[in-house]
Amino acid sequence: MLESMFTEKEMKEVIKEKYNIEVIDLEKINRGSASITKIITKDKNYILKEFQDKYDKEFIIKEINIINFLKKRNIKVPKYISCKNGKYYFFHNRRVVIMQEFIEGYTINNNNGTHNQIIESAKYLGLIIKELENYEKLYSWNINEWFN
């Protein structure tokens, strides 16, 4: 897990500046390789994700494009929130930062799911793979680089 480069005060100010969203509270989410913070507002919740330095904006733009592609095909994926300037990301201390709508749910540790949870996960993975077969740009990228 990556530590945030924001203080709590800075994060609230930047969210107001970049997204025009008033933050009520912040909650750290301790999972994944990025720094993830749940953003609680009056109307809905979001996550703010700060990526490791090794992920440049081109990498993040690829991810955003794929997620938006899947969303248009009714796959349950997080919705990216655009900044006031229309971009889906910004930089803070050399890190790429994005905001997504928060999705209620649960996370299962590796090898700890029930039979039904594994079947449900496999179903969604199959749907994602099926739709990505129609994503033309995918074949022009070196996917192996994503996992190094």
Annotate each language-model stretch with its function.
Residues 52-95, 116-119:
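A conserved alpha-helical element in kinase catalytic cores
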Residues 107-113:
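AlphaC helix of the protein kinase catalytic domain
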Residues 1-25:
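Juxta-kinase regulatory segment immediately upstream of eukaryotic protein kinase catalytic domains
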Residues 18-41:
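ATP-binding glycine-rich phosphate-binding loop
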Residues 115-148:
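A cross-family kinase active-site recognition segment
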Residues 27-30, 79-82, 139:
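Short beta-strand
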Residues 93-106:
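Conserved short submotifs of the Hanks-type protein kinase catalytic core
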Residues 35-60:
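ATP-binding glycine-rich loop module of kinase domains
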